Amino acid sequence: MATPRLTPEQIAQVSGLVAKYVATQCERSASRAIPLSVPQRALMGGFFSPLLIDETRLLVLQGEWVANPDFYPMLRSLGFNNLPDQSAMAAITFCDVVVSHGPFSNGLLFHELVHVEQYRQLGIPRFSGLYVRGFLNGGSYGAIPLEVNAYTLGGRFEQNPANRFSVEDEVRRWIAEGRLQVCRWN
C-alpha cells in the first residue's frame, strides 16, 4: 500500500510530535545512561569528534522496551500501516542518548553515533522534519535519507575499521549537497 499523502500542515504537525517525542525520550533516558566505555571510545575515536564521544550517553535496556510514540494511533487512522516499531529496533538515538534493546555491537554503535552527529548538526526539530519527510517520500524506514547516510557510513566502517574518516565532515557534506532532503515533500 502506498504511503498516505499528508498536507503541509499535517507534515509540520507530525514533525513537531516527533521532535517532542525525541526530546522527551532523551530527557527520560539521560539519567540512566552512561558514557561510552574506554574500548568503545578507542574504537570510535578518529571517526567522531572527542566532544561527541564525551557527550554521548548509552543505555542498554534489560527486560523493557522503548514504547511507540503516543501519536501512532493518530497516524494509523490516517492510513499508515508500516510505522517503525520502536520495540523491534536494535537501538534508537534520542539526540545524544542512545537507547539499545541489547548489547551494542561495534557496527550498531557506529550507526547510532552517526545519528548523534546528525542531531548535532541539524538540531532536533530539523532532524525530525527530515526524518518524517524521508519516511513519507520513501514509504519505509530503509528509504529515509538520514538512515541511508548512517547505513552508508556504517558500511564503510564495517568494511575497514582501521580506515578512519570524519563522520562530522561526511554528514556536513551530505547536508550541503542536499542528500538528506527529499523533493516530493519539501
Task: Enumerate the language-model features and the residues they cover.
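Post-HEXXH active-site segment of zinc metalloproteases
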Residues: 94, 103, 107, 119-148
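Active-site recognition of the HExxH zinc-binding catalytic motif
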Residues: 44, 107-119
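An active-site-proximal "capping" alpha-helix that borders the catalytic cofactor pocket
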Residues: 43-48, 146-158
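Auxiliary, metal-adjacent structural segments of Zn-dependent hydrolase domains
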Residues: 32-92, 170
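Non-catalytic architectural context of zinc metalloproteases
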Residues: 1-20, 24, 71-81, 85
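Long, well-structured alpha-helical subdomains associated
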Residues: 160-186
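Short, contiguous pre-domain boundary segments
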Residues: 19-30, 171-176
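Active-site metal-coordination segments of metallo-dependent hydrolases
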Residues: 30-38, 138-151
